[in-house]
């Protein structure tokens, strides 16, 4: 239902899409979980143990994990639309056909925990911390952008083509991965 709702282009809430009742949640958010680690110093088993250490504690009662894998303009998986993220650990995994997005989704569901994909709508090249990624679509369509704080170039969602481009990127995610929901993070 989530894929159908996104493809329809209609604004719907998670409650509308999933037909659920409102409830209190205990959420663990993982903000760019792998990017901060030196991939040469651990293996996937270590990574999984590390990321689920908190959720695996029965006293905590986590019922959902929100995974933020990237800045939204680059892919941490093998994408047909987006360039691969410029973080070495992800580049290595993509090259080796290791889909960390699917692995962590499966690990989350195996624990009976809901998994949400958190997607930054405007990240990757506007954080103001140096070393920002080059985003090919922004380079080829400067007319789709406006200037944000510190001179960063931000998608202008008032432009139909920007909305369509982002919608197609989101559609790729929800068609390839069976997450329980999709968070659109407009804070960046």
Feature map (PLM): residue ranges:
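Glycine-rich, proline-tolerant flexible connector loops at the mouths of alpha/beta enzymes
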Residues: 68-91, 186-188
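Conserved, mostly hydrophobic/aromatic
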Residues: 55, 65, 108, 166, ...
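Active-site-adjacent "subsite" loops/lids of carbohydrate-active enzymes
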Residues: 5-42, 91-106, 115-176
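Catalytic domains of carbohydrate-active enzymes, especially glycoside hydrolases
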Residues: 45-76, 176-181
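Outer-envelope exported proteins of Gram-negative bacteria
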Residues: 64-68, 114-120, 181-185
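Short, low-complexity, polar/charged sequence segments that are solvent-exposed and flexible
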Residues: 43-46, 84-86
């Amino acid at each position: 239902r989530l894929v159908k709702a996104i493809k329809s282009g209609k604004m719907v809430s998670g409650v509308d899409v999933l037909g659920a009742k409102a409830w209190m949640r205990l959420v663990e958010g993982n903000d760019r979980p792998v990017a901060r680690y030196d991939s040469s110093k651990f293996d996937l088993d270590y990574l999984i143990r590390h990321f689920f250490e908190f959720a695996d504690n029965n006293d905590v009662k986590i019922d959902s994990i929100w995974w933020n894998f990237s800045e939204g303009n680059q892919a941490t998986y093998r994408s047909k639309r987006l360039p691969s993220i410029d973080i070495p650990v992800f580049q290595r995994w993509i090259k080796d056909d290791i889909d960390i997005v699917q692995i962590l989704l499966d690990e989350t569901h195996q624990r009976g925990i809901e998994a949400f994909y958190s997607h930054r709508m405007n990240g990757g090249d506007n954080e103001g911390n140096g070393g920002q990624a080059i985003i090919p679509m922004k380079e080829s369509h400067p007319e789709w952008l406006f200037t944000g704080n510190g001179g960063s170039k931000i998608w202008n969602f008032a432009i139909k083509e920007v909305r369509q481009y982002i919608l197609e990127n989101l559609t790729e995610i929800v068609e390839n991965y069976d997450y329980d929901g999709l968070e659109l993070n407009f804070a960046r």
